Amino acid sequence: MKLISNDLRDGDKLPHRHVFNGMGYDGDNISPHLAWDDVPAGTKSFVVTCYDPDAPTGSGWWHWVVVNLPADTRVLPQGFGSGLVAMPDGVLQTRTDFGKTGYDGAAPPKGETHRYIFTVHALDIERIDVDEGASGAMVGFNVHFHSLASASITAMFS
């Protein structure tokens, strides 16, 4: 499985348009374009996440969680997680560690460089039975048991 983006390059700096607007940052808070291919046989749905493992919480920080993307989905356009693009029926964006749904960009403590890992997971089930209030950890727990494959792009920001 392969993940690509018109907006991100693995190991490069996260562009300003994908940085949080708040907490001392003035980014545009727009979710990036993501596309994937080489999907494994038997894929019934996808989950897309953005996770910061470097957040000073002891458990990282979930910036974006999208569940129940249909098996024929291959692209999330820029702005999908920011309310700029309509979501298909049944697709949910669950609660991030900012306490709300949708995409929220990078906002590390000043002077720290963090990794932002954008991942698509191919699942062997059509849907994860969660609601919008589910945490990234709860979604991740469910993904663990149903993942056929995954692919990631890691962007950096400080």
Curated annotation (Swiss-Prot):
Record localization: Cytoplasm
Family listed: Belongs to the UPF0098 family.
Subunit: Homodimer.
Keyword rRNA-binding attributed: no
Protein name according to UniProt: UPF0098 protein YbhB
One Pfam family of this chain: PBP
Signal peptide interval: none
A GO term from the CC aspect: cytoplasm
InterPro entries: PEBP, PEBP-like_sf, YbhB_YbcL/LppC-like
Membrane-spanning intervals of the chain: none
Keywords for this protein: Cytoplasm
Domain of life, per lineage: Bacteria
Cytoplasm as UniProt keyword: yes
